[in-house]
Amino acid sequence: YRPFLIRNSLQEGMSIINPDMVQAINFSPGGFEAKYGDKMSSSLNIYYRQPTKFELSGEASLIGGRLSTGLASKNQKFTALLSGRYRNTNLVLNTLNEDTDFNPQYMDFQTYLNYKINDKWALSFIGYWSKNDYEMIPKVKEVDFGSLQTPLKLSVFYDGKEDDQYKNVMGTATVNFKPNKKWNFTLDAFGYQNREREYYSIASAYMLQTFDPVTGEPITSYDVGGQIDHARNDLLVKTMGAQLKSRFSPDVNTDYEIGVKFEKEDLEDNTNEWQLVDSLGYSTPRDFVLPGELDPSQLRLRYHIAGANHIQPTRISAYVQYSKKFFWGDNRIFVNAGIRASHWDFNDETIISPRAQFAIKPNWDMDMLFKISGGIYYQAPFYKEIKDLDGNFNPNIESQKSMQVILANDYEFEMVKRKFKLTTELYYKKMDKLIPYYMGNVRIRYSGLNNSEGYAYGIDTRLFGEFVPGVDSWISASYARVYENIDGRGDISRPTDPRFRFSMFYQDYMPKFPSMRVNLTLTYANGLPSGTPISLDNNGKPDFEAPYNYQRKLPSYKRVDIGLSKVFIDQKDNKASGAFWSNFQELTLGVQIFNAFNISNTVANQWVNDVSTGYNYP
């Protein structure tokens, strides 16, 4: 879950993935089956586990913790898994290079219940609740930049605060009926509600100075100005619906699957957001005046977005697919073909998406699997895509479209008597009817028009295994490019063009003291091309073609985390004695050092416009 109105990386909160509840996670960069929905990019499937006996686990740290418990009846007919998490990143955020009071609090609760009535009927329920509160009171911020010949210093003084709230509730109740070994029916009833509030009123005054490179003494100020940012944005999203799925398996190697889904949506959006920039007696943007004269016109807002929208559309989708496993000589083959159709009555659009997958596992001494998949995929529009630059919902918006081809290889092998797995995926996507967007910090704002096309290609690799006997580690690397062509002006990098990324998780321990462990997490990624100052057109709206004239990439992202831990109890290698301690499956005490080398990373630039020179300073 990620809030819709989020604009700052500090507001993101916790991932919906709770490691205490998840059994397995499957990720695909594309080319997935028809039953997995309408998405143009990637697919993430999360499988929850069922406990087999009573269990209790917890984790505590200086920024929060989590507590989870699992229950199971003696006959295993009823199982329950419950988990709650809390996080407050005060200690981390207040170490930033700025005088700001932060009070971010994130909490959530998840539950997974199962009850097997008999061999034919089973019930289950998944529930999720989260509440994110983000309060920020900025005071002072100072940044030194420039060159040795022209050192600059920006001092910003703030007044006001930001107070945001994000609440989310969702649940799915499932009835599963299996009359015999060949047929299986599943009925899901689900509900979802998301309530978000983004309120801020912050006035800021800045002073841009230069210094004598020899003496270090300040010289006359370049610019003095002020800015007021104001927003009262509210969003309420409610979705209710049902889904019926059926699978027919005439034999263990063949599946026919069909599904129908009905959703009733309710979106209520109220937006009132504006920004005023002022400098020495005039506001910007401003009309041209002669040097030394003041602009006699009234203050003009740099931008103003206001809109009130309330829609209650209906979305219907269906899919059918066929899967088959068989032998071709000594080679194992898997094929899947399917088609998916969806209709949304808000824009009265129907989309049809054919897809196919083919995999072969040769009878080689090497354990390898090759897979090719592809099809036509759509990104069905929702709240962000349908909202235009005036704050209104656009009923003429269309689904973004892509044609995809994905090649994949899995290679399992042994090295120094330890098991390893290498996965590699190559993909190419030709995209059409794209909606241009820009990124302000982590906020994505769409233009509301299908006036772009593009393409993407890349390679992902991951090596997983026991680099050190008994503990798992992994290394991953990827290279990808994403381009778009807005109104036929030529190819340009999209704001999320990732390029190169490398990450590693490595675990080790002392041979004589295996209970003493250390882990190292290393991440490096090229900076995104979203470091461009947001340019406004004559109507005060973002100019999505401005990057054709100027585009700046953010600095590369670099981070190293180090963890130290002592395993007191491990029922596999370090069993505990005593009636009480023997009940513990694992007991570990550890210290995690985030960003161990204190590397400063840039998620986004805050651009300051020097009206005297016309330059933008990041």
Locations of regions flagged by a protein language model:
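C-terminal beta-signal and adjacent terminal beta-strands/loops
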Residues: 470-473, 523-541, 566-618
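N-terminal periplasmic accessory domains that precede
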Residues: 10-15, 30, 34-55
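Transmembrane beta-barrel wall of Gram-negative outer-membrane proteins
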Residues: 63-86, 99-138, 162-191, 251, ...
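Gram-negative outer-membrane beta-barrel transporters
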Residues: 326-331, 428-430, 449-535
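Short acidic/polar hinge/loop motifs at secondary-structure boundaries
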Residues: 2-27
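Membrane-embedded beta-barrel scaffold of Gram-negative outer-membrane proteins
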Residues: 184-190, 197, 399-457
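Flexible loop and strand-edge segments within Gram-negative outer membrane beta-barrel domains
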Residues: 89, 100, 122-123, 127-178, ...
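Structural signature of Gram-negative outer-membrane beta-barrels, strongest in the C-terminal barrel
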Residues: 237-239, 251, 261, 302-429, ...
